[in-house]
Amino acid sequence: MFKFVKSSSDYTNWYFHKNSEIAFWGRSNVGKSSLLNALTSKGLAKVSKTPGRTQLINFFENELNQVYVDLPGYGYAKLSKDLKDKMMAMIEEYLLNRSNLKMLYLLIDSRLGFTKIDLEILSFLKENNLNYFIVFTKIDKLNTKEKNELNKKIKTYLEKESFNYLIVSSETKYQIDKLKENINSNF
């Protein structure tokens, strides 16, 4: 069973331990908290309809000493530029300096596909040789035509870049077990 360990705004407050950890990141309102709750089968993370709620790095741990990290979302326009810059610096510091981090799960909203900011984040991850796995969220919100469009976008992007991905739904639990298997392979 997972439990909340702590929230942190900078390096001095990180949760220090010797175990492996994985992190979840994506646009604001992409469904990070809902996905964490689907993966852990409990209301671990606070889910909000308001984007930009998570503004700290949140650490969770289970009895197997597996650590999940919930990173603040990016791209929320209503936050001040100063706060957005501070949050991005905090996340960058975490991603570039966290030796415990084994895999970053980058969440992409299936309804939007790859946005400009998602592509910028992917470039940052590649430039810094960070391990990442793409998770397309909210597939349950798409009709058949939209699912076909998403698959075309993924195929087009795969022609340019190679990446591993899964399409999931926190709501219906579609492919959540496959994602759990992937996550467990990183511990």
Swiss-Prot record:
Binding site for GTP: 26-33, 52-56, 70-73, 137-140, 168-170
One biological process term in Gene Ontology: division septum assembly
Disulfide bonds: none
Binding positions (Mg(2+)): S33, T54
SUPFAM superfamilies in the record: P-loop containing nucleoside triphosphate hydrolases
MF annotations from Gene Ontology: GTP binding; metal ion binding
Pfam families for the chain: MMR_HSR1 (PF01926)
Cofactor or coenzyme needed: Mg(2+)
Gene3D superfamilies: P-loop containing nucleotide triphosphate hydrolases (3.40.50.300)
Alphabetical keyword list: Cell cycle, Cell division, GTP-binding, Magnesium, Metal-binding, Nucleotide-binding, Septation
All residue ranges annotated as the EngB-type G domain in the record: 18-187
PANTHER family xref list: ENGB-TYPE G DOMAIN-CONTAINING PROTEIN, MSS1/TRME-RELATED GTP-BINDING PROTEIN
HAMAP family on file: GTPase_EngB (MF_00321)
Family of this protein: Belongs to the TRAFAC class TrmE-Era-EngA-EngB-Septin-like GTPase superfamily. EngB GTPase family.
Function: Necessary for normal cell division and for the maintenance of normal septation.
Protein name, per record: Probable GTP-binding protein EngB
Organism: Mycoplasmopsis synoviae (strain 53) (Mycoplasma synoviae)
Gene responsible for this protein: engB
